[in-house]
Amino acid sequence: MTVITIAKRGLPKLTTSTSSTTTASSSSTITSVXSSSSSLPLLSNSTSSSIIPSITPPSRNGNPYILDSGDMPNGTVFIVVGGIAGVIFLAILLWWVITTYSSHRLTRSVQDYESKMFSXQHTQFYGDSPYMDYPAKENFQDQVHISESDISPGNKDESVKDALVSHTNNEKPFLSNFERPLSSLVSESNRNSLFISPTGDILYKTRLSKLYQESPRLLQKPVIMTSDNVSTNSLVSTISSSSASSLDNGNEKEVGEDIRKPAKIASSPSRKLLNSPESDGSVNRNHSKGNLLVVQSKRKPTPSTYLEHMLEGKEQDE
């Protein structure tokens, strides 16, 4: 018979059990002798005991330190940690997608704006430049150029001559001044400096007007008609007229000394071509057709010519 006593505790423990074994044996021997005799049986008792250890898990009843995991799946801790890490990763991925998309849209909008601003079809010649003054912008939008079919065959040769003259006189200074999208105060002479000199701007405009006077043919642009069939002056005539008005101040003599040209300009082939009878006729026709502004050339003698005439005894008018 084995008796096990278990104490109620929260931790496993070793228990000792005692077992008793009783063995009873009896033997009887009967010897038959000629004479009859009898013997008593012998009784023997033996007792043995052994200790058997056993592990008993603690009960969760009334024990707050044992989690009741009967309703939860296995690996709950790993599932929770993985879910938190996944949420963080998805948040970072969503933020990256949103910022990339917004920056891409901003870049595209900037590129579209720059392509509109600096493309050949959105310059100030088409009236779409925001840097142009509003009256000049309206002037360019209302211009309608005469087609090639409207030019008579007799004028085509003269137009070819005009083109040759314009190429020989180098139109680059004029184009550089017409195409600049800045105000007239920022000229070629002072645009690299933060200081804007009114005197320098007047000198710059005066040099331009003198250059126009020496090359009247360059002032003649194709006849431009507005929507009201009224001829308009070009930007060249506008600039030359505004610069000519600036010569009325007291600095006219000082400015004139600064812009004198050598005498070889008067003897250039382009000058002879401009002074030829055919060129004068074409100038008159262009005047009657477009009423364009032509500035009469009025040049002062060069210092060398003035000294020669003074030595020869000739009087020169200032």
Swiss-Prot record:
InterPro entries named among the record's database cross-references: PRM
Swiss-Prot/TrEMBL keywords: Isopeptide bond, Membrane, Phosphoprotein, Transmembrane, Transmembrane helix, Ubl conjugation
Membrane-spanning parts: 78-98
Segments for region (Disordered): 15-56, 238-318
Annotated crosslink Glycyl lysine isopeptide (Lys-Gly) (interchain with G-Cter in ubiquitin) location: K314
Annotated Basic and acidic residues bias: 250-261, 309-318
Chief location category: membrane
Record-listed Phosphoserine modification sites: S129, S279, S282, S288
Polar residues biased stretches: 276-285
Domain of life the protein comes from: Eukaryota
Subcellular location: Membrane
Regions of compositional bias (Low complexity) in chain numbering: 238-247
GO CC list: cellular bud neck; fungal-type vacuole; membrane
Family as reported in the entry's similarity comment: Belongs to the PRM5 family.
Protein name: Pheromone-regulated membrane protein 5
Organismal lineage: Eukaryota, Fungi, Dikarya, Ascomycota, Saccharomycotina
